[in-house]
Amino acid sequence: MDALIARGAHVRVVDDLSSGRLENIQAHVNSGRVSFIEADLREPGVARSAMKDIQVVFHLAADHGGRGYVDLHQAGPASNLFLDGLVFWEAIKAGVEKVVYASSGCVYPNSMQTDTAREIYLKEQDVKPPHDADNMYGWAKLMAELTLQAYHKEYELGAASCRYFTVYGPRGVENHAVIAMIARAFVGQNPFEIWGDGQQIRNWTYVDDIVDGTILAAEKIQDGTAVNLGTMERVRVIDAAKLTLEFAGRKADFKFLRQMPTGPANRVADNSLAKKLLGWEPKVMFREGLRRTMDWYFADRKPEQVKERLETMLTAR
């Protein structure tokens, strides 16, 4: 939102505020640069009216949470099949020039992500039959990518899909791993809980880099090509937790909750296609991004309020 406004765009936002916070964009709404519609895009007529006179649609709406939500609530993410199809069809009917879709690393085969001993980087061409996506959330994202490509071919709808890898940063919520770790450090949790054995590998990608890549995709991709937006920095969960505690100035023992959802063991993007097509590469590595995110989180909350709601927040939307 901030980046689009800085580029001079006039923006219309649709959000049912089931997980978002209006205060994040309130200043832009007050300035008149953003028009806000509080509604569910799945309700009759909402998507059609929202897209009137719009040139580019950034479709980020989804029923989604973190790993706890994705694993424990399959029906919710499955409903994204309907949501995505509706948005794409109404974009065509409204004469929208391009749809930029927020896809996910969850489209990649589970079978490629099981061994932490392998230094593997997921490439766009790895998504191919026989498909093996991650949960209903991943299957819905995959089908949306394929639908957009088909709509480009048949209806000449401009399209691009951005496969986001473990996004984090200010304005994030506690059901995602990095914010969850920050919340645990913030309230002084001891023992400090980690889902799984802590050896899972991720390439956490800072939100500002994701925003830049998404806008570049809108500018440079037309045919529905999907690109990875993620760092190639390999970070173990246990190391991220240790760094979080270090930045918070706290010490704690670790308690590994091996029965909790953990996702794939080894998920890291190859971002060479984004570099080639978009001229994009991440600027904020994990250490700096974590520090920025912790500064934001610690300044905005009271420990007693977070502690009271933490367990619910970890698995909710």
Indicate residue ranges for each PLM-predicted region.
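NAD(P)-dependent short-chain dehydrogenase/reductase
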Residues: S111-Y121, L142, L146-E219, M232-R234, ...
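Short alpha-helical
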Residues: G20, G65, G172, V235-R236
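C-terminal substrate-binding subdomain of Rossmann-fold SDR/epimerase-dehydratase oxidoreductases
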Residues: A3, F186-R317
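Generic recognition of short, well-ordered alpha-helical segments
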Residues: E23, R48-S49, L72, F82, ...
